[in-house]
Amino acid sequence: MEDLKPREIVQELDKYIIGQDHAKRFVAIALRNRWRRRQVPQDLRDEIAPKNIILIGPTGVGKTEISRRLAKLADVPFLKVEATKFTEVGYVGRDVESMIRDLVEVTVNMVREKEEDEVALPAMKAAEERILDILLPPRRETQPFADAEGETTLEIVTRGDSNQDSTREKLRKMLHSGKFDDRYVDLEINERNTPVVEIFSNMGMEEVGFNFKDMLGGLMPKNTKKRKVKVSEAMEILTQQEAQGLIDMEKVVKKALSRVEESGIIFLDEIDKIAVGGGKGQGPDVSREGVQRDLLPIVEGTTVNTKYGMVKTDHILFIASGAFHMTKPSDLTPELQGRFPIRVELDSLTEHDFMRILTEPKNAIMLQYQELLKTEGVELVFTQDSVAEIASIAKEVNDRTENIGARRLHTVMECLLEDILYDAPEVPEKKITIGAEMVRAKLESIKEDEDLSRYIL
């Protein structure tokens, strides 16, 4: 999906995110540039670095959602990290590299799941044979044979008997029809209970995780644990085991490392919290500047050692975000500013935006509540004037207290629908219409009392 044109990317983002057209255009261009880079001759390809982006705007306006939807749309490795995670006391530089290690871990799992999906059919067939072997064990015969020291018995497992074959096929049909789903069978499950050992080096107590299972691989003895499980669950367990045996983990890791290096996106949230405003070099500001210095090589391009191998960060796209209430982007160190050449200011949400957020996206808030109540047989209907009233109250509370953007709508909706959600299983009226009067009656008293609105809405 990375070959989508910028206009198509924006159209896809519009299905889930209201407004913020400027930000959508920039992230769409950044994604398209990835595709363009791959079309460039090899000698120049390595020289073209991604243009990292800083999204500036208050909370709840769509900064994280834009990045997350972009990654999902393009099906690329994505990781969200908080910049404040790297400001703890005793912070050392290697901790910044943990986000690359986490991204690799996420990508390996992503690629492995896709590979397992591709071998799902043969894995299911193999699992089915193993289930049938449990339900109808192969016939065992013992035959005597003579060796140098005398006569010994030889056990032969046969599966060629025609009666047994026909019984096996009958069992297979019953298995397919689900007649054995609730029957319990004894299943031996392989487990490797190997300890994870953390080694702390003398260079700033940097944490390096070594797993004996990874180091020794097949040398570690397999512990098998016998469990009594339903046939339906046994089928899932055995299918997973067979799939793991069919995929080549070396190929998975190689593909995952390549995807991280070429397509990875890291969303660095709350970068404004590590910006140094006003008096520099005092107290925690020293730590914040240190964090920026440690982030710099990762963002500009370095090689990070992970348990799967070395990863170059030169072409990973970094999208940073922050509200910048107390600080400005210019409070970041000049070197780090230079690594984020694109700055996009997101707009605060208007009352009209709130109305659209409630009804238009594919995952619209009102649609979510309607679908939830539909499971109880309750039809929930919102009139147009109720939508306008909810948007108006959310905007007013945001203006009077803390501006938390679209997240305020969830709070308002929960307060509005509290009684309906509670009484839904017993309510006799299966069609409930929410009008503006009901919204005002339910929320007006809370909205007017500033103390209550601060704590409830």
UniProtKB/Swiss-Prot annotation:
It holds the Pfam family AAA. Its main location: cytoplasm. CDD domains: RecA-like_HslU. One of its GO terms (molecular function) is ATP binding. GO terms for cellular component: HslUV protease complex. It is found in: Cytoplasm. Keywords: ATP-binding, Chaperone, Cytoplasm, Nucleotide-binding, Stress response. The keyword Chaperone applies. ATP binds at residues 18, 60-65, 269, 335, 407. GO terms for biological process: protein unfolding; proteolysis involved in protein catabolic process. It comes from the Bacteria. A double ring-shaped homohexamer of HslV is capped on each side by a ring-shaped HslU homohexamer. The assembly of the HslU/HslV complex is dependent on binding of ATP. ATPase subunit of a proteasome-like degradation complex; this subunit has chaperone activity. The binding of ATP and its subsequent hydrolysis by HslU are essential for unfolding of protein substrates subsequently hydrolyzed by HslV. HslU recognizes the N-terminal part of its protein substrates and unfolds these before they are guided to HslV for hydrolysis. Belongs to the ClpX chaperone family. HslU subfamily. This is ATP-dependent protease ATPase subunit HslU. It comes from Desulfatibacillum aliphaticivorans. The lineage of its organism: Bacteria, Pseudomonadati, Thermodesulfobacteriota, Desulfobacteria, Desulfobacterales.
